[in-house]
């Protein structure tokens, strides 16, 4: 689960991290009062969407010359003018895809005198099985380019889970970021605080980009991104209240209600599979034959007829889907249950695109019999390769 920047900063402020004063608004009419409540005279007006690259993004409804999703303002009047242009319009960034995301809220923040921009994130480094700091002196909007072009400028410092962030860890991170003076002193409290927040709130990612050194020498969290482990949300009612479902794919929200592992993708072949490994193999072979999967959908090992039907309806609700491939290896999951669920869903929502079903495992013959006797336009496949060829051929006509 992701949250907005202003929410992430409020959470970090509770852990003692240095953040600027700011106010989130939902309406243009709130912009002037929000700006007046801040010290000024420099303000930053930030689009709040769950995507990076906002500063370099462009609004669909505005001219190409218009400014992006993060703007400086030197007066309250300029803050209001920016709010009028940004709220309600669609921001397209490198991470949103061509569709973009509608900006429904802004964060108006006090400006900062920036001396240096740094990068700092915390994540689980699976290569060593520990939480790690990933840092670079090259922070700001182009961190992706740094990672691609000059990866040697990014350093990783793994943390011993028993010891936590030690003085030696702080020194190593500070050295990697070339901190000295007041910034190095601030680091002694900031990095342990970030680590504590990451662990206590069961985050999957905590990214501060940029972490700035101000002209007075002190550190400040200028932007913050947080992603939480969805499997741990039951422990964090305070975090769950921060969820903004308008920023999420409606199909993924519906899937979560049925405990389905569903991720929307950009392709045109819908996939329904049991087991994450088989799901990834199915997506791979679709790509091998020249098409792209429209989703990752794992119905799990113990799904019943209703859950299978729900998964099928979610897949068919995607207007990009031009064909559907159901690939089931029945172990705990029985092939006849899959067949009954697919048929129930098809009868309810109709079938306007080609459907290929490959079944193998427990009750496979019964499952095939149910499909064959359904009278529906369902194409059977003998194996995964055959299934992929058939669904691609059906789409290509």
From Swiss-Prot:
One of its GO terms (molecular function) is succinate-CoA ligase (ADP-forming) activity. Keywords: ATP-binding, Ligase, Magnesium, Metal-binding, Nucleotide-binding, Tricarboxylic acid cycle. Substrate binds at residues 274, 331-333. ATP binds at residues 46, 53-55, 109, 112, 117. It catalyses: succinate + ATP + CoA = succinyl-CoA + ADP + phosphate; GTP + succinate + CoA = succinyl-CoA + GDP + phosphate. Pfam families: ATP-grasp_2, Ligase_CoA. Its EC number is 6.2.1.5. Pathway: Carbohydrate metabolism; tricarboxylic acid cycle; succinate from succinyl-CoA (ligase route): step 1/1. SUPFAM superfamilies: Glutathione synthetase ATP-binding domain-like, Succinyl-CoA synthetase domains. PROSITE patterns: ATP_GRASP, SUCCINYL_COA_LIG_3. Coiled coil: none annotated. One of its GO terms (biological process) is tricarboxylic acid cycle. The keyword Nucleotide-binding applies. Binds 1 Mg(2+) ion per subunit. Residues 9-254 form the ATP-grasp domain. Heterotetramer of two alpha and two beta subunits. Succinyl-CoA synthetase functions in the citric acid cycle (TCA), coupling the hydrolysis of succinyl-CoA to the synthesis of either ATP or GTP and thus represents the only step of substrate-level phosphorylation in the TCA. The beta subunit provides nucleotide specificity of the enzyme and binds the substrate succinate, while the binding sites for coenzyme A and phosphate are found in the alpha subunit. Belongs to the succinate/malate CoA ligase beta subunit family. This is Succinate--CoA ligase [ADP-forming] subunit beta. It comes from Rhizobium leguminosarum bv. trifolii (strain WSM2304). The gene is sucC.
């Amino acid at each position: 689960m992701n949250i907005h920047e202003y929410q992430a900063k409020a959470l970090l402020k509770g852990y003692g991290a240095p953040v600027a004063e700011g106010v989130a608004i939902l309406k243009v009419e709130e912009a002037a009062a929000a700006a007046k409540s801040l010290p000024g005279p420099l303000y930053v007006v930030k689009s709040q969407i769950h995507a990076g690259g906002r500063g370099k993004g462009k609004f669909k409804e505005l001219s190409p010359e218009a400014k992006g999703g993060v703007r400086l303002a030197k007066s309250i009047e300029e803050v209001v003018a920016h709010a009028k242009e940004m709220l309600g319009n669609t921001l397209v960034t490198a991470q949103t895809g061509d569709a973009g995301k509608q900006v429904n809220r802004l964060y108006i923040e006090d400006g900062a005198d920036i001396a240096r921009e740094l990068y700092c994130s915390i994540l689980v480094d699976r290569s060593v099985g520990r939480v790690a700091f990933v840092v670079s002196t090259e922070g700001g909007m182009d961190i992706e380019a740094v990672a691609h072009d000059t990866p040697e400028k990014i350093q990783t410092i793994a943390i011993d889970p028993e010891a936590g962030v030690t003085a030696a860890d702080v020194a190593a991170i500070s050295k990697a970021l070339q901190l000295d003076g007041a910034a190095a002193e601030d680091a002694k409290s900031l990095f342990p605080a970030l680590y504590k927040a990451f662990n206590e709130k069961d985050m999957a990612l905590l990214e501060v980009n940029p972490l700035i050194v101000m002209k007075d020498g002190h550190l400040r969290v200028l932007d913050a991104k947080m992603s939480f482990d969805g499997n741990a949300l039951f422990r964090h009612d305070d975090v769950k209240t921060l969820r903004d479902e308008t920023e999420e794919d409606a199909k993924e929200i519906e899937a979560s209600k049925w405990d389905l592992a569903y991720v929307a993708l950009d392709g045109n072949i819908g996939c329904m599979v049991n087991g994450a490994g088989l799901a990834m193999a199915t997506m791979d072979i679709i790509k091998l034959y020249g098409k792209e999967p429209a989703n990752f959908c794992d119905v799990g090992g113990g799904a019943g007829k209703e859950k299978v039907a729900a998964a099928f309806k979610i897949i068919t609700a995607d207007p990009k889907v031009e064909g559907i491939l159901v690939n089931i290896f029945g172990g705990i999951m029985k092939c006849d249950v899959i067949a009954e669920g697919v048929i129930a869903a098809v009868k309810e929502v109709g079938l306007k695109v080609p459907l290929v079903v490959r079944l193998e495992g427990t009750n496979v013959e019964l499952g095939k019999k149910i499909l064959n006797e359904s009278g529906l336009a369902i194409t059977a496949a003998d194996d995964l390769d055959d299934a992929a060829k058939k669904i691609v051929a059906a789409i290509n006509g």
